[in-house]
């Protein structure tokens, strides 16, 4: 993640493109360049703090010592903590730890949605201010009471906040047994054993504390004389992540060793729960920094098999480990199989993996245009989503170099970097960032990225958390130009959040499918609702939901309203 760019092996673009002839299903993914295929300009509008009321700012505690955690946080989340149907916002901050003593009190922030485009800080009343050097957040209803709970990852000790259902939370970390000591990063709620309860996977980064801090620099470079740089994570030892099984009584059991997680120590950042082989058991794709990425395939709830190497997602070209940070999963080419994406450091290119239906993947970053667009970028949070509701899956990425001294060395790599927006015309991805308005020209220290429709207009909005800076709230304008139906799924036999559900929908000549994944991005958590875009078509013919195991229910819903959210409950035949 923190190495200085140099001469790296690069995929020969023309050779890669020619290789698509062997895979006809790649042809329609090739970089689209027709300006007529591009969506309207200015798809997102920045909502300034003066308008939103979100005045909180992230403080990294940056020091001349260059302690590694300073450059990596933090995350953000959309969640409806009070169950009023409107997405609230949670932001994670740094705090006191063995290497950082803040000059003033620092805290995380929970902002309640006022339903008018503004937010009110309710952190103190809710009791979710944190208490350490925060990293990320994951929202999920682990006890099935209908209110989202909140897991906050930290350097040192993480926190589980149980939602009391009255606007307040209780720290139940010790009782639940999920403190996950060490340096935790991303986390995800998902039901790995299909017992109907959400379990918890927590990524762990390197073996680090103040006593293990190294002074790293480049004494041979005059521009860095006497200065420390953030160390390359390669010098730190990898650590195994955690898997906690939900016992159904408010407690969890650490099953990391039993399930094969501890067999694979890593330097893990992002995680997404998905189903890469369509067997109905949720798998995990984990981004690792300077060691191979993990693809933990769930062998029917009995054990996870790590197949990153054999699947083709563990390494970059030439068999080299890259600096994986953010991840996501979606059925990009609509063949019924979930694809994968990972962001990396500059000069490594981001990884875009198309599922070959046999537990192997092809990296199509070259022919899709991703490699060319990301050569000089360092990516963190990202999400696949249909931002303009035309029925095609687009891609948004937050970027920013982790080393704030990089500009003293290189002319073409910057510390702060702009967002990247790729529009899917149905024929491929087009990088439309430069023509998408001022916000996409702004350099920022992007880290977390969360999706959520905060104004309930069906156009999914975006929250970006920036390192040592204010967050960025983006209102989606483009999505309002097309028709949509939003789904709120409630499981009964399956997990209440319905993580793992498969949704298929038909509108005239348009047929699409998606999956409700768990997690994704970097240190962040998202609106649990799903928005189905259908473009200019005026009617949704039907929506089919295949509920996750242990449910065996498959339901088809018709006579659907347009341009509004509806509630679908497992086993109940009518939408609400």
Regions found by a protein language model. Name each.
Residues 89-93, 149-154, 200-204, 284-288, ...:
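Hydrophobic beta-strand segments that make up the repeating blades of beta-propeller
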Residues 1-9, 19-22, 33-34:
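N-terminal secretory signal peptides
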Residues 93-103, 207-235, 398-414:
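Short, conserved, GDST-rich strand-edge loop motifs in beta-rich repeat architectures
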Residues 7, 27-54:
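C-terminal segment of N-terminal export signals and the immediately downstream linker at the start
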Residues 73-83, 134-144, 184-194, 198, ...:
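Beta-propeller blade termini
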Residues 43-57, 61-64, 68, 120-132, ...:
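Short loop/turn motifs that recur once per blade in beta-propeller domains
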Residues 40, 50-51, 61-62, 369-372, ...:
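Gly/Ser/Thr/Pro-enriched helix-cap/hinge segments flanking short amphipathic alpha-helices
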Residues 9-18, 119, 169, 252, ...:
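N-terminal export leaders
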């Amino acid at each position: 993640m923190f190495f200085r760019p140099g001469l790296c092996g690069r995929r020969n673009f023309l050779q890669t493109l020619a290789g698509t002839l062997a895979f006809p299903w790649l042809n329609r993914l090739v970089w689209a360049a027709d300006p007529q295929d591009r969506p309207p300009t200015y798809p997102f509008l920045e909502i300034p703090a003066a308008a939103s009321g979100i005045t909180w700012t992230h403080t990294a505690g940056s020091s001349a010592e260059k302690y590694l955690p300073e450059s990596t946080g933090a995350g953000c989340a959309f969640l409806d903590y009070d169950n009023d149907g409107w997405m609230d916002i949670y932001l994670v901050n740094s705090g006191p730890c063995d290497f950082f003593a803040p000059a003033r009190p620092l805290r995380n922030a929970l902002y309640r949605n006022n339903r008018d485009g503004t937010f009110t800080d309710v952190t103190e009343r809710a009791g979710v201010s944190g208490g350490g050097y925060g990293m990320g957040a994951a929202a999920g209803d682990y006890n099935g009471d209908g209110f989202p709970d909140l897991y906050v990852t930290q350097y040192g000790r993480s926190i589980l906040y149980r939602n009391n259902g009255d606007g307040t939370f209780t720290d139940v970390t010790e009782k639940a047994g999920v403190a996950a000591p060490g340096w935790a990063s991303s986390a995800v709620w998902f039901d790995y054993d299909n017992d109907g309860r959400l379990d918890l996977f927590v990524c762990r980064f390197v073996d680090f504390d103040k006593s293990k801090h190294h002074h790293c620099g480049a004494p041979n470079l005059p521009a860095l004389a006497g200065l420390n740089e953030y160390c390359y994570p390669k010098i730190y030892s990898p650590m195994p992540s955690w898997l906690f099984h939900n016992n159904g009584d408010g407690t969890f059991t650490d099953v990391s060793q039993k399930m094969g997680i501890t067999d694979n120590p890593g330097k893990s950042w992002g995680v997404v729960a998905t189903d890469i082989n369509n067997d109905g058991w949720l798998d995990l794709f984990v981004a690792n920094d300077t060691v191979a990425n993990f693809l933990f395939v769930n062998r029917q709830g009995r054990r996870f098999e790590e197949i990153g190497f054999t699947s083709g997602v563990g390494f970059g070209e030439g068999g080299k480990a890259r600096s994986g940070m953010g991840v996501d999963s979606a059925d990009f080419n609509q063949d019924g199989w979930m694809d994968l994406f990972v962001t990396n450091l500059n000069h490594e290119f981001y990884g875009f993996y198309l599922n070959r239906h046999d537990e192997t993947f092809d990296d199509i970053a070259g022919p899709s245009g991703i490699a060319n667009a990301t050569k000089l970028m360092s990516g963190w949070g990202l999400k696949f989503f249909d931002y303009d509701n035309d029925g095609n899956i687009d891609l948004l990425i937050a970027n920013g170099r982790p080393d704030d001294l990089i500009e003293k060395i290189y002319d073409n790599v910057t510390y702060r970097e702009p967002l990247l927006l790729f529009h899917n015309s149905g024929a491929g991805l087009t990088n439309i960032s430069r023509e998408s308005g001022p916000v996409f020209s702004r350099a920022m220290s992007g880290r977390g990225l969360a999706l959520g429709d905060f104004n309930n207009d069906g156009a999914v909005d975006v929250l970006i958390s920036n390192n040592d800076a204010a967050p960025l709230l983006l209102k989606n304008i483009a999505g309002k130009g097309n028709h949509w139906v939003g789904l709120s799924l409630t499981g009964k036999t399956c997990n209440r959040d319905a993580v793992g559900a498969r949704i298929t929908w038909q509108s005239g000549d348009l047929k699409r499918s998606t999956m409700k994944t768990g997690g994704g991005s970097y240190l962040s958590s998202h609106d649990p609702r799903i928005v189905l875009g259908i473009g200019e078509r005026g009617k949704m013919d039907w929506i089919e939901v295949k509920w996750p195991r242990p449910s065996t229910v498959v339901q088809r819903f018709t006579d659907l309203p347009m341009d509004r959210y509806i509630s679908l409950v497992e086993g109940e035949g009518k939408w609400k």
